[in-house]
């Protein structure tokens, strides 16, 4: 494996000099901040327990503040449903008994509750939707009855499974009507969430978050100031800037535009972050998303150039787990203007754009300089272990993580073992 150069003082100074300040009025937005430190969140996929063989117990919980469990599906009438009942609550792990009395949850639900018990600062959120299952959001959000049904069924899963909040991943509201309905949907979830907390968990604050786009065509349709008021966090999906859908090779998750090579930077994170803040989102509610994977391009002369095909991948064409990178024979290169790494093999002419630990350090310095809320990663199974972990690198760079406690009391869970706190 190639070793990456540590970030120098000069690089940090150059980064700080590059940053432009958002509008002061929005930097100082008057909002209630419940977290007592930075978020270091990661999406955990329920399909990851299969071929990827990544189980809840494999999470390095000491590095993580929020596990976002994905994904739940939803129906057109707003009903939230499990996308995989076996992975979610049926699978028996090695330490699960087949002779338990009562109705009990197993699978990832029980395993994540065990992780919560052992790590009281780690919160688990239920993520609904995602790219594949966003089709029914417009209908689910379109009427008061559907919104109420969505909130009711989402919160039922949250309390039955012993989770600490709800994450909505609607990709993406397509127009002003859908954007307005999204706010109404979030407000309904918040209202029912708070009513549940008042009755069953007095004083506890269940979280409400979304995954949000970094592409202007998508976020320009959103009601940013309203999102900033109703949500605890906005997890900015600051990746997938280039890929098989692109006409030319490009950076997957660059911080800035590169004027000398604009073809390599069709999108950039800094523009999105500034637009969200200037649109009325409190900076400390923006969590900067980072990829734990790389996007590949074949038969290319370099970044911002033509290519022919994306090749294979770890699990799908053109996408490689970070733990498989850099590939043998490739040289890691850095675009110091765009702030983005990529590997290139001059013999095979394959280019892969991905975030290195050094890039994570740069991004954390960036988010801290703007007063953002922390880091988010997609997704847990693709990380390396030990010192090369990007999640761990983010933890070390952030410093003080949020340590607000999770909840272990769910007196009306339908599962006896969750109701009893696995005691």
Swiss-Prot record:
Propeptide residue range(s): 23-34
Q: How is it used?
A: The antagonistic activity of Trichoderma harzianum is used for the control of several soil borne plant pathogenic fungi.
Its UniProt entry gives the catalysed reaction(s) as: Random endo-hydrolysis of N-acetyl-beta-D-glucosaminide (1->4)-beta-linkages in chitin and chitodextrins
The protein's induction, as recorded, is: Specifically induced by chitin and is catabolite repressed.
Cite the SMART domains for this sequence.
Glyco_18
Q: What class of enzyme is it?
A: hydrolase
Q: Is Metal-binding given among the entry's keywords?
A: no
Secretion signal, residue range per the UniProt entry: 1-22
Q: Where does the UniProt entry place glycosylation sites? A: 218
Q: How does activity depend on temperature?
A: Optimum temperature is 45-50 degrees Celsius.
MF terms from GO for this chain are:
chitin binding; endochitinase activity
EC number(s): the record gives: 3.2.1.14
Tell me the active site.
171
| GH18 domain location | 38-401
Any one GO CC term of the record: extracellular region
Q: Which UniProt keywords apply?
A: Carbohydrate metabolism, Chitin degradation, Chitin-binding, Cleavage on pair of basic residues, Glycoprotein, Glycosidase, Hydrolase, Polysaccharide degradation, Secreted, Signal, Zymogen
In terms of InterPro entries, this protein maps to:
Chitinase_II/V-like_cat (IPR011583), Chitinase_insertion_sf (IPR029070), Glyco_hydro18_cat (IPR001223), Glyco_hydro_18_chit_AS (IPR001579), Glycoside_hydrolase_SF (IPR017853), Glycosyl_Hydrlase_18 (IPR050314)
GO biological process: what's one of them? chitin catabolic process
Q: What is its subcellular localisation?
A: Secreted
Q: Carries keyword Hydrolase?
A: yes
What are the coiled-coil residue ranges? none
**Domain of life per record:** Eukaryota
**Family per similarity comment:** Belongs to the glycosyl hydrolase 18 family. Chitinase class V subfamily.
User: What name has this protein been given in UniProt?
Assistant: Endochitinase 42
């Amino acid at each position: 494996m190639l070793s990456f150069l540590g970030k120098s003082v000069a690089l940090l100074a150059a980064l700080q000099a590059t940053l432009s300040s958002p509008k002061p009025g929005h930097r100082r937005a008057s909002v209630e901040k419940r977290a007592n430190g930075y978020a270091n969140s990661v999406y955990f996929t329920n399909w990851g327990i299969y071929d990827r063989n990544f189980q809840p117990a494999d999470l390095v919980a000491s590095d993580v503040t929020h596990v976002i469990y994905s994904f739940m599906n939803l129906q057109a009438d707003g009903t939230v449903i499990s996308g995989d009942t076996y992975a979610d609550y049926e699978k028996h792990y090695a330490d699960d008994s087949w002779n338990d009395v009562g109705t009990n949850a197993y699978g990832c639900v029980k395993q994540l509750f065990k992780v919560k018990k052992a790590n009281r600062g780690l919160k688990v959120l239920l993520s609904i939707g995602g790219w594949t299952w966003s089709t029914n959001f417009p209908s689910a959000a379109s009427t008061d009855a559907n919104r109420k049904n969505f909130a009711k069924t989402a919160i039922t899963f949250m309390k039955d499974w012993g989770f600490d909040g709800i994450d909505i991943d609607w990709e993406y509201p397509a127009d002003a009507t859908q954007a307005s309905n999204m706010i109404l949907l979030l407000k309904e979830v918040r209202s029912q969430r708070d009513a549940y907390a008042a009755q069953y968990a007095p004083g506890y604050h269940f979280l409400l978050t979304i995954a949000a786009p970094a592409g202007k065509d998508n976020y320009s349709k959103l009601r940013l100031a309203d999102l900033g008021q109703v949500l605890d966090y906005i997890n900015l999906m600051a990746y997938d800037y280039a890929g098989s859908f692109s006409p030319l090779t490009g950076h997957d998750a660059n911080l800035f535009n590169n004027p000398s090579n604009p073809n390599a930077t069709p999108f950039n994170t800094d523009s999105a972050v500034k637009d969200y803040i200037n649109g009325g989102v409190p900076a400390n509610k923006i969590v900067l998303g980072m990829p734990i994977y790389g996007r590949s391009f074949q038969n290319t002369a370099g970044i911002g150039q033509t290519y022919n095909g994306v090749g294979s991948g770890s699990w799908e064409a053109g996408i490689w787990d970070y733990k498989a990178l850099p590939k043998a024979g490739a040289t890691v290169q850095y675009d110091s203007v765009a702030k983005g790494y990529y590997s290139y093999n001059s013999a095979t002419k394959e280019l892969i754009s991905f975030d290195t630990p050094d890039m994570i350090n740069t991004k954390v310095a960036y988010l801290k300089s703007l007063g953002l809320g922390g880091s988010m990663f997609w997704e847990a199974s693709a990380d390396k272990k030990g010192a090369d972990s990007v999640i761990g690198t983010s933890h070390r760079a952030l410093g003080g993580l949020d340590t607000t406690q999770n909840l272990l009391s769910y007196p009306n869970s339908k599962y006896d073992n969750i109701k009893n706190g696995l005691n």
